[in-house]
Amino acid sequence: MKALHLTGNTLTLDEVREVVYEQRPVLLDSDARAAVDRARAVIEDVVANDRLAYAVTTGVGKLSDVRIPPAENRTLQLNLMRSHAVGVGDPLSEQVSRAMMLLRANSLCKGWSGVRGLVIDTLCEMLNRGVHPVIPSQGSVGASGDLAPLAHQGLVLIGEGEAFYQGKRVSGAEALRAAGIKPITLEAKETISLINGTQAMLAVGLLAVLDAEILAETADAVGALALDVLQGTDAAFDERIHKARPHSGQIQVAANLRRLLAGSQIHESHKDCARVQDAYSLRCMPQVHGAVRDTIHYCRSVFEVEMNSAVDNPLVFPEPKKVGERSDAPVHGDIISGGNFHGEPVAFALDFLAIALSALAGISERRIERLVNPALSEGLPAFLAPGAGLNSGFMMPQVTAAALVSENKVLSHPASVDSITTSGNKEDFVSMGMTAALKLQRIVQNTRNVMAIEALAAAQALDFKAPLKTTKLLQKVHAAVRAVSPQITEDRILTADFAAAEALIRSGKLAAAARN
């Protein structure tokens, strides 16, 4: 695969996916390197002349009033990296670790952070050679960015900390040595540029968006199958209804449901029944699924801005290069302290996405209830069980779905409405974005499991509808489910079926089955 040139300005979510999951190689773009070098020259000029600049010739946080002499700058870099690596808890996945390295490297490529190109090159080489820092998941309050997670990432660059390499958890020094990467000695400002930013919460958020897009598409396919076997109507998806309330997600879902439900023998068998409208979990799929799609789109837009932003502090703004300027001329510029590390924009989006996916799981669970409840299932066997009574069928899977949905409700409480004071009251309002990200991870997994149960239940219900057939597209959905989970003809342990259906959804294959 062709190497991705990082510029700091053009990274896309699809490129993140390619680097994280498909190991696309990355490197620092040559034009970006020139900008990086120019900003670095400003830092070196400040250090050489011992001028006052936050985090360059001073301590950080509450200790920003302490001057650091140039002779002690390397010690400061090492101390900052070690002292900020205070994470606890289970490590983030290797995929999140890869995303964090990519995002940090891309942000530094903008040329407003003041690091050497060598720092970015080393991050890129770690990505390319599969050195993935072990990053504890807890310990960030989301301002000044994700300090602890990013410090654990930075430790590996200097040959410390731990890394996953070729399936093993080893020391950072051992991982670099095995991969043929030389550890670096950090110079002035480079530690703060590596650890001050939103890349941990953002990495989790970006991967969650990729998962959420698959879930949203899968929800339409599984929901359509549930509606058909429950003898629902597609009248509520009439294009005129949705043009009257033209939210883009709603219009998109309604059109998708019309496409999925066209040509069903099951529908034809009850078209003259007396029921004029369905329950909300069936009738309002465009409004609910559509709102989820709109939320995903909004969160994606926030994250795409963030991943092409400079988010450390202070930022370095070199003077424009003059015509005829000598290559060895000193470069001057402004070093300005600000707050781009603050995770609030990302935290809000993470919380919003959590709420949306919680709703998607909730409506899925309500359809499961209709499939298994003989008072609601339009003639299907109780709990979709062959020989109900002797067999319990889907009685307990609905309970599992209910448990997951209820957990999601608790996890959907916004983390970003909370704050706590840190660093001697210097950092007195924080985003809690990493907490939002970790909750979102759990909600994504719970939602996928709920949808897996709905897919299994809807497939089981369709089996009972034979010889009547659903639409050709929904037959493909059914076939995809049956390829990983056979029909339940008597009670069996369903744990493996749940896992297989969850993996089918996660891979995107179930959504793909319904496309054409």
Curated annotation (Swiss-Prot):
Organism this protein belongs to: Koribacter versatilis (strain Ellin345)
GO biological process: L-histidine catabolic process to glutamate and formamide; L-histidine catabolic process to glutamate and formate
SUPFAM superfamilies registered for this protein in UniProt: L-aspartase-like
This protein's GO CC annotations: cytoplasm
Gene3D superfamilies reported in the protein's UniProt record: Fumarase/aspartase (Central domain), Fumarase/aspartase (N-terminal domain)
Domain of life: Bacteria
EC number of the protein: 4.3.1.3
Reactions performed catalytically: L-histidine = trans-urocanate + NH4(+)
Subcellular location: Cytoplasm
GO molecular function, one term: histidine ammonia-lyase activity
UniProt family annotation: Belongs to the PAL/histidase family.
2,3-didehydroalanine (Ser) PTM positions: 144
The entry's keywords: Cytoplasm, Histidine metabolism, Lyase
Main location: cytoplasm
Residue location of crosslink 5-imidazolinone (Ala-Gly): 143-145
HAMAP family: His_ammonia_lyase
Protein name, per record: Histidine ammonia-lyase
Pathway: Amino-acid degradation; L-histidine degradation into L-glutamate; N-formimidoyl-L-glutamate from L-histidine: step 1/3
Modifications the protein undergoes after translation, according to the UniProt entry: Contains an active site 4-methylidene-imidazol-5-one (MIO), which is formed autocatalytically by cyclization and dehydration of residues Ala-Ser-Gly.
One Pfam short name: Lyase_aromatic
Top-tier EC class: lyase
NCBIfam families: hutH (TIGR01225), PRK09367.1 (NF006871)
